[in-house]
From Swiss-Prot:
Its cofactor is pyridoxal 5'-phosphate. GO terms for biological process: glycogen metabolic process. It catalyses: [(1->4)-alpha-D-glucosyl](n) + phosphate = [(1->4)-alpha-D-glucosyl](n-1) + alpha-D-glucose 1-phosphate. The gene is glgP. Phosphorylase is an important allosteric enzyme in carbohydrate metabolism. Enzymes from different sources differ in their regulatory mechanisms and in their natural substrates. However, all known phosphorylases share catalytic and structural properties. Keywords: Allosteric enzyme, Carbohydrate metabolism, Glycogen metabolism, Glycosyltransferase, Pyridoxal phosphate, Transferase. It comes from Mycobacterium bovis (strain ATCC BAA-935 / AF2122/97). GO terms for molecular function: glycogen phosphorylase activity; pyridoxal phosphate binding. Its EC number is 2.4.1.1. This is Glycogen phosphorylase.
Amino acid sequence: MKALRRFTVRAHLPERLAALDQLSTNLRWSWDKPTQDLFAAIDPALWEQCGHDPVALLGAVNPARLDELALDAEFLGALDELAADLNDYLSRPLWYQEQQDAGVAAQALPTGIAYFSLEFGVAEVLPNYSGGLGILAGDHLKSASDLGVPLIAVGLYYRSGYFRQSLTADGWQHETYPSLDPQGLPLRLLTDANGDPVLVEVALGDNAVLRARIWVAQVGRVPLLLLDSDIPENEHDLRNVTDRLYGGDQEHRIKQEILAGIGGVRAIRAYTAVEKLTPPEVFHMNEGHAGFLGIERIRELVTDAGLDFDTALTVVRSSTVFTTHTPVPAGIDRFPLEMVQRYVNDQRGDGRSRLLPGLPADRIVALGAEDDPAKFNMAHMGLRLAQRANGVSLLHGRVSRAMFNELWAGFDPDEVPIGSVTNGVHAPTWAAPQWLQLGRELAGSDSLREPVVWQRLHQVDPAHLWWIRSQLRSMLVEDVRARLRQSWLERGATDAELGWIATAFDPNVLTVGFARRVPTYKRLTLMLRDPGRLEQLLLDEQRPIQLIVAGKSHPADDGGKALIQQVVRFADRPQFRHRIAFLPNYDMSMARLLYWGCDVWLNNPLRPLEACGTSGMKSALNGGLNLSIRDGWWDEWYDGENGWEIPSADGVADENRRDDLEAGALYDLLAQAVAPKFYERDERGVPQRWVEMVRHTLQTLGPKVLASRMVRDYVEHYYAPAAQSFRRTAGAQFDAARELADYRRRAEEAWPKIEIADVDSTGLPDTPLLGSQLTLTATVRLAGLRPNDVTVQGVLGRVDSGDVLMDPVTVEMAHTGTGDGGYEIFSTTTPLPLAGPVGYTVRVLPRHPMLAASNELGLVTLA
């Protein structure tokens, strides 16, 4: 019989063991092995049974065992030491505090940062993620904690979490949704001084009000606020807003995003008030899902500070960072305009929004405008609300600039103000214990952030590096066998049929991993393009490979499920099922062992559709060698010695032909480059050339792929400048914001009438030489703007056959006088910087000291 209601009862801890409560509810335990070992010591079998979940362990352990441990001097000593270590971790100065103490530059650092994401993959016990976006967000929080960055994170609490994947007998994906009880998770409910739950409210129109309570997950030093709509104060349909991650239709999705953005800002205000903390100065949108946060902040400034919309927008833009993770328009949330209008439009007959009281509804809607007038684009809104934006690798930055070029019409894609911060991964979460132990031996620290750890790897005997890699591969093989057995039993097999699994996979065979979400562009089945060639690789008598595949398809994506089924059916064949397997229910615990144990990490997306691809980083962090298309981070950091590049047939329009070519290149690399190097052994059985590639990978990629490097990049290049801009715009009763907003209004009004009436060039000899002096003079009508309101530039560069400027160089032109009819004269003299076919033009751009860049407003006039 089924229970009517499920809830969790926590055990009462003896007073001497009270510290276990803090250790279990601060998720720092998930990346601190000594703390994990302490919980395992309570009851090793139960620890495994509970899935390494301290809260579940303490709820299930026999009270008599707790009483016994309360008298165990050795256990108590370890407990006291770890409790003291956690308290020290939470309070001692870390990197961020050291920067604050460093002097003048520290004045730029924000007092707090709010980080918004629809998913967070912090630990297995809190399955609030579906893929790389959530895992990245979790790594961002953990690294921010390790660095002491004052971050507050905001997301949604999903009652069902992400689905558990299993396979039917014929290999079709089946989803089940676990019911998550927040009382059984490392969460605490945010309450007020009276002990009552703090609720945030969002008015949705038609007198509907969406309310949410706030669960707080403590991620080291970083609080993660998770909004939960499943409360009695909501109507039945609104209780389900936070039921599933990426579940439901667009109506469901927009309610989630309204709650995450508007409700998320209100949750931060409530949390900082309850905890008596300084409100954050900088707001970071991890993708466009939480874009409504910017509009809520505008509402605050309009209703609470009395600002007009444009001045409030100026303040919000100055302090907002937007990160895009998608390389294709199809990956952007776009809602029907009429749907958005229903939520934000005039509900009271005065043109003001009920959802965001005090704001003109038409201004809200305009922020999401795109080429299709029937759509509201969340990424466009995010970019319009943020003064600073970035992609997640150098290549993705270039792709993003091209994709969003329309918002900066008149500028070349390279000039679009979207930068890049290459993603990173949290080493304590993803590095195998063996590598952390090696770090302690080499440098006295298991902090892989220390450069000396990587530098000293040259001291390590190749045989020892190979021993670590072999040990990790053996651990993976044991795990694969266990998961294979479980999957086959779930699919209807009996133990009598599964004797072959005991020898499936081989700890001495070259092991290739491919694990990720299953959208079409990641090409899960490229490896099956020529089944005969793959079979030869798997069954080669001298140099076999074994292949482990995992990944989930979105529940609504039958195309992705069909790709999984193809792999499963191939892997089910008796002749090579001991060499290839599809493992269902790809999650953090499976991923960790794959990253540790795979010799080669395979990635074959359609270039340039992989924004970053952090799974390959985690493999590299453990000495795995990447075999990948030059996409995402691999395009940036592949050096010819840290893995292999799969040649990309970028110019081939026929998709089938392209897949054939790239699959053929993949098979050739495995057979002719990868496998020979792995199986070439010296007299000690060590593959010297392979191990040197492992060493090189660790030394060169190890420091680069760290999320600590990523977070430092955000702090230095995005958060600190945003905090400085915010302080300028918000200071002195918002005078600077009013000035900039007024300037923007004047510029936007004048710009259609600005005209470059004439451009004259003088000074060049009949046969110009490199370095010859060119004088440019432009006559410009400024339509009411002053000369110091604009920047006039000469733009020089090589020209192609169509006279398009290539690799242009800009030279600022000085205001030299006023001509007839009120035209302003600008001129410059510059040496020719290039040889060959050269051309020039002149353009006018906005100029204001509060602009982050002259192209920020998207205004430009060309000659």
